Amino acid sequence: MRSDSIPTTICQEGKKDPVEMFHSGQLVKVCAPMVRYSNLLKLLLSCSFRREKIYVRPFSSSFTADSRLAFRTLVRKYSCDLCYTPMIVAADFVRSVKARDSEFTTNQGDCPLIVQFAANDARLLSDAALIVCPYANGIDINCGCPQRWAMADGYGACLINKPELVLDMVRQVRNRVENPRFSVSIKIRIHDDLARTIDLCRKVEATGVSWITVHGRTVEERHQPVHYDAIKMIKENVSIPIVANGDIRSLKEAENVWQMTGTDGVMVARGLLANPAMFAGYEETPLKCVWDWVDIALELGTPFMCFHQHLMYMMEKITSRQEKRVFNALSSTSAVLDYLTDHYGDDSTF
């Protein structure tokens, strides 16, 4: 775990308190855990070139690990209020120094910050929370990831069907972390029977959860429309903050969902990958944001593959097919910098 010597109070400053932000009455704009960076980029490439035969380099899981602090730094420059880490398996994090060093990197400017854990054991989760407590504002329990591996290991969305385990995990973190301002939140999907979801939310509220993020789809749903009406119903049945998540691609959509559901914030994943300046009101990625990414990624030592793939995703909708073909084939940082300078100079827009 790398923290650049962060003071133990840096993420508990009053002006950075997420709970207070959610109670402000203003839209809180949240960057999601981004657990599927590499899958999204793989999909991007297959969609962009589906009619052409191309070679796609294998995607490494290190893409998430090596770019996450840099990406959080970028979106914070463009009106993102709160960032999550990618999902970290609590058991590995607790048992392995190597896992901690590779999975969690932060710095003094990286706050407010929520560390999201995949967990199925209350003691291990609370151990993990104790480790990150000095460096983050809180932890989040992933109860919404529908990926097969996660559910097979007892993590993610299967937990919405294990309410007693979720309650125990929340309770143990609350009991063992002494800092009263350290938040404990959960991220869930909805049940087919919404009454079960509302019951779960009421129970975790009574146990002391700080807020709940609701992805408005069931475990089985992938590309179906998001059930914003279900999110609204959940919000109307609890008193704690609720964050809406699912298919938000612009600031206007974020504001519409916020107003439609009556929630306290919105969480965005894919929309921010495509346009990290989305929360600042940009409809497309401005060139300034691209150059900001270049500066941040190079300063933080982001490996080329991660650096390049983020740019590919940011520029996918604002470059032509021919430009994509050339840019995506670049194989060095210097080549990327030369391409950006030659084609776009330092203009503020594409």
Segments predicted by a language model, with ranges:
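Alpha/beta catalytic cores of nucleotide-metabolism and tRNA/nucleoside-modifying enzymes
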Residues: 1-35, 41, 47-65, 69-70, ...
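Glycine-rich, positively charged N-terminal anion/phosphate-binding segment
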Residues: 6-19, 36-52, 63-132
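Catalytic beta/alpha-barrel core
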Residues: 75, 161-163, 213-223, 244-246
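Non-cysteine beta-strand/loop elements that form the S-adenosyl-L-methionine
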Residues: 85, 138-146, 206-216, 266-273
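Active-site-adjacent beta->alpha loops and helix N-cap segments on the catalytic face
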Residues: 91-102, 147-172, 176-177, 193-195, ...
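Active-site beta->alpha loop and helix N-cap motifs at the rims of alpha/beta catalytic domains
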Residues: 110-184, 189-197, 205
